[in-house]
UniProtKB/Swiss-Prot annotation:
Binding site for substrate: R64, Y206, K212, R332
Gene transcribed to yield this protein: pckA
E.C. numbers: 4.1.1.49
Cofactor details (free text): Binds 1 Mn(2+) ion per subunit.
Organism: Salmonella choleraesuis (strain SC-B67)
The protein's name: Phosphoenolpyruvate carboxykinase (ATP)
Similarity section: Belongs to the phosphoenolpyruvate carboxykinase (ATP) family.
Cofactor (UniProt): Mn(2+)
Length: 539
């Protein structure tokens, strides 16, 4: 639909001139026709699949580009932001000067000038009191489709007099030739100005930069108001009991929160305020590598008309080879949240969480499939944000790569990690919430813990049977492990049982414990961090 109150003249205020036409808040049918326009070339062009969803390629960037992320350092951000060049912890918040910002802004506005543009007005945040009104400006139809899927779609009434709090200008086709002189990482850039409230994108076509860009902004604004901002999925049971699932990419956030027995609040980004837990988004962004109808039926059936596939292999007959990771292992699909049947309606929010689940995919095979955390262990493991990946090599040698990502989302944090931990703990204490560490990764057999066992573990957490189970303590990590759980193979609950000998586990566990201790060093420069050391592994 075209709304008369947004004209090319209005865009001059942003520095975008001589716009040929504005396609404002296009319908899904309009986007479908635009994406499949045979006149399109390169990465603008979509391909129709037999599932009804359009598939696109995002070019050389098949994931985010954290090394190309910058934030303007000015009076707004100087003393509040977690900068990459201050303190012990590493992060991606590289400072940008006002001068370089103006240059980058000029590149993007020049790129968008004289074009036919898609403008999508959305909300970020399901709670009307704290949501951001976000305007996306792009020349690429599928990028407009992506944000229409991923953000909250305003009603026609809400669009009347829509005033954006934040503007995202996507100039994917332009790059910065002066990057070397400006001391930047490359010709590509994802830059934020929290005073002007603008995000600029140049050189990368990856849709996730728009999604995670707004997450970084919410991560700045909300905790300063005492509201938890979380990289997690969330769902609610029949009795109104809310659970949140923290975890890095590939640990099972989307899969485990999409549960036929519970209604989905959202799969990736949430806030927690005085009313309860609310989704930031209006869609889901699921990994599709090795997707099968049998293992993940809800996600598979969500891939239909209006869903948008990224970087998958589409065969000549229009069928999708979900097993093919030749372009990237990070193949994805975005779809509006209502493509999942069992969701919270009409607004993606619910009450206070009583179960907080930290998901880790431990490729070292050391951590138990589930353990119950004390209050201090909750903060320790939240700040550690551990997972580990298996990296394949030509000869099949697979050495695990550890990842410690503060708050299970360090790439998106704009404040110091301890600020998120403090707000989360306050919210948990007020709600009487309990935290658990769930390992969805590997054990001593070299096999990944089955989705079936993990789902049974999650059920035991959610129905309270884990809280009533007898527990024993795992050495080194001092984790409380249940002796048995309904529907779970008792043998695997103690990770030592999956090794040929307890000594083998001990050796690997000692190596992993050292990594935890080394990583946590960066928090010991504050009294609060120092106090948490005892909640971690002890050698």
């Amino acid at each position: 639909m075209r709304v008369n109150n947004l004209t090319p003249q209005d865009l001059k205020a942003y520095g975008i001139n001589d716009v040929q036409d504005i396609v404002y808040n296009p319908s899904y049918d309009t986007l479908y026709q635009e994406e499949l326009n045979p006149g399109l070339e390169g990465y603008e062009r979509g391909v129709l699949t037999n599932l009804g969803a359009v598939a696109v390629d995002t070019g050389i960037f098949t994931g985010r580009s954290p090394k190309d992320k910058y934030i303007v350092r000015d009076d707004t951000t100087r003393d509040t932001l977690w900068w990459s060049d201050k303190g012990k912890g590493k992060n991606d918040n590289k400072p940008l000067s006002q001068e370089t910002w103006q240059h980058l802004k000029g590149l993007v506005t020049h790129q968008l000038s004289g074009k036919r543009l898609f403008i999508v007005d959305t909300f970020c945040g399901a709670n009307a009191d704290t949501r951001l009104s976000v305007r996306f400006i792009t020349e690429v139809a599928w990028q407009a489709h992506f944000v229409k899927n991923m953000f909250i779609r305003p009603t026609d009434e809400e669009l009347v007099g829509f005033k954006p709090d934040f503007i995202v200008m996507n100039g994917a086709k332009c790059t910065n030739p002066q990057w070397k002189e400006q001391g930047l990482n490359s010709e590509n850039f994802v830059a934020f100005n929290l005073t002007e409230r603008i995000q600029l994108i140049g050189g990368t076509w990856y849709g996730g930069e728009m999604k995670k860009g707004m997450f970084s902004v919410m991560n700045y604004l909300l905790p300063l108001k005492g509201i938890a901002s979380m990289h997690c999925s969330a769902n609610v049971g029949e009795k109104g009991d809310v659970a949140v699932f923290f975890g890095l990419s590939g640990t099972g956030k989307t899969t485990l929160s999409t549960d036929p027995k519970r209604r989905l609040i959202g799969d990736d980004e949430h806030g927690w305020d005085d009313d309860g837990v609310f989704n930031f988004e209006g869609g889901c962004y699921a990994k599709t590598i090795k997707l099968s109808k049998e293992a993940e039926p809800e996600i598979y059936h969500a891939i239909r008309r209006d869903a948008l596939l990224e970087n998958v292999t589409v065969r000549e007959d229009g069928t999708v080879d979900f097993d093919d990771g030749s372009k990237t292992e990070n193949t994805r699909v975005s779809y509006p949240i209502y493509h999942i049947d069992n969701i919270v309606k009409p607004v993606s929010k619910a009450g206070h969480a009583t179960k907080v689940i930290f998901l880790t995919a431990d490729a070292f095979g050391v951590l138990p499939p589930v353990s119950r955390l004390t209050a201090n262990q909750t903060q320790y493991h939240f700040l550690s944000g551990f997972t580990a990946k298996l990296a394949g090599t030509e000869r099949g040698v697979t050495e695990p790569t550890p990842t410690f990502s503060a708050c299970f989302g360090a790439a998106f944090l704009t404040l110091h990690p301890t600020q998120y931990a403090e707000v989360l703990v306050k919210r948990m204490q007020a709600a009487g919430a309990q935290a658990y560490l769930v390992n969805t990764g590997w054990n001593g057999t070299g096999k990944r813990i089955s989705i079936k066992d993990t789902r049974a573990i999650i059920d035991a957490i959610l129905n309270g049977s884990l809280d009533n189970a007898e527990t024993f303590r795992l050495p080194l990590f001092d984790l409380a492990i249940p002796t048995e759980l309904p529907g779970v193979d008792t043998h695997i609950l103690d990770p030592r049982n999956t090794y040929a000998s307890p000594e083998q586990w001990q050796e690997k566990a000692t190596a992993l414990a050292k990594l935890f201790i080394e990583n946590f060093e960066k928090y010991t420069d504050t009294p609060a961090g120092e106090a948490l050391v005892s909640a971690g592994p002890k050698l």
